[in-house]
């Protein structure tokens, strides 16, 4: 105990005589310091007891107090994490105390509001730094004059002062932005070409089933139809495993499934051998009013029995053939 008392006495003498008041500080931090100090004192006392070969049972109250302090310190830790942001903010504010104190207060009391506004504008970003810096020689268009910079800054200051008065937020006008009005067409990849390039023009060996060997899976199909077939297989598998019927397919899905079966023969897809110059989607596009009127007039001439050109007769024949296929 004498050694402990001497060490404490020397530590007290090393401390400054006038200690700063902590009434305006964070109470949680002060409490943590007090708890840590008490915990260290109790722990040092028990170490001395252990050195004297005494039992802890004689100092049971000190052990209980030590456990209580340990629990309180652990309970403070989550609270300290919550106020960590506020503590860091206060520390940064204390570090900037000298910078803030260097700004002189206005002498007249009537200009307090204007001084506060000017103090806010003191920390605004430098708008001249937002200009693009080109690597090449500076041209007359890229060089910003000092008069323009001052006019821009004055306009921004007026805008900020106006928004501060009426309470309406107005974004800073740093640079004019033009919105793109033109719609860009999306390039849709051709799956047939991709499959041809990846399979036929590649030198990498591939394992392909023989003709007619996988009829249950509809044989070899193109990449575009493979996804539709996979969806149909999953649908059938779900119905068979759950003993239930799913809702009927929509007209769009039925049309896709028929399109898959259209060029299927013997478990193989022969659509590449029957490609027309004009695709079905291209031929089914809606014509303009003048084209439809001409076709209607030509069709009426043929039905009336009047003479028509071979081109008109061929058009009417193809139209009738197309209608019969739809039936």
UniProtKB/Swiss-Prot annotation:
Region annotation (Disordered) ranges: 127-170, 298-327
GO MF annotation list: RNA binding
Residue ranges, compositional bias (Basic residues): 317-327
Biological processes annotated in GO: maturation of SSU-rRNA from tricistronic rRNA transcript (SSU-rRNA, 5.8S rRNA, LSU-rRNA)
Cellular component, GO, one term: nucleus
Keywords attached to this entry: Phosphoprotein
Modified residue annotations for Phosphoserine: 153-154, 309
Listed name of the protein: Uncharacterized protein C18B11.06
Naturally occurring in which organism (per UniProt): Schizosaccharomyces pombe (strain 972 / ATCC 24843)
Lineage: Eukaryota, Fungi, Dikarya, Ascomycota, Taphrinomycotina
């Amino acid at each position: 105990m004498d050694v402990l008392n001497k060490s404490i006495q020397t530590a007290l003498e090393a401390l400054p005589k006038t200690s700063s008041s902590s009434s305006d500080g964070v109470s949680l931090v002060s409490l943590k310091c007090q708890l840590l100090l008490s915990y260290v004192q109790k722990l040092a006392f028990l170490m001395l007891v252990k050195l004297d070969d005494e039992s802890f049972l004689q100092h049971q109250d000190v052990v209980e107090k030590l456990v209580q302090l340990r629990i309180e310190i652990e309970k403070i830790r989550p609270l300290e994490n919550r106020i960590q942001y506020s503590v860091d903010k206060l520390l940064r504010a204390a570090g900037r105390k000298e910078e803030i104190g260097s700004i002189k207060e206005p002498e007249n009391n009537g200009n307090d509001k204007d001084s506060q506004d000017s103090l806010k504008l003191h920390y605004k970003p430098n708008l001249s730094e937002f200009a693009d810096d080109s690597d090449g020689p500076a041209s007359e268009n890229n060089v910003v004059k000092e008069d323009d910079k001052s006019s821009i800054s004055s306009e921004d200051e007026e805008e900020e002062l106006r928004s501060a008065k009426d309470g309406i937020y107005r974004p800073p006008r740093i640079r004019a932005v033009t919105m793109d009005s033109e719609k860009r067409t999306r390039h849709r990849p051709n799956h047939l070409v991709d499959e041809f390039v990846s399979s036929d023009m590649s030198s990498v060996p591939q394992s392909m089933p023989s003709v007619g060997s996988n009829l249950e899976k509809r044989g070899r199909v193109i990449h575009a139809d493979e996804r539709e077939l996979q969806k149909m297989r999953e649908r059938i598998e779900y119905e068979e495993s759950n003993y239930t019927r799913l809702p009927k397919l929509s007209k769009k899905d039925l049309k896709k499934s028929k399109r898959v079966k259209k060029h299927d023969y013997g478990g193989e897809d022969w659509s590449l051998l029957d490609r027309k110059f004009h695709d079905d989607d291209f031929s089914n596009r809606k014509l303009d009013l003048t084209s439809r009127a001409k076709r209607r007039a030509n069709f009426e001439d043929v039905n009336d029995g009047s003479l028509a050109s071979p081109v008109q007769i061929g058009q009417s024949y193809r139209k009738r053939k197309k209608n019969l296929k739809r039936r």
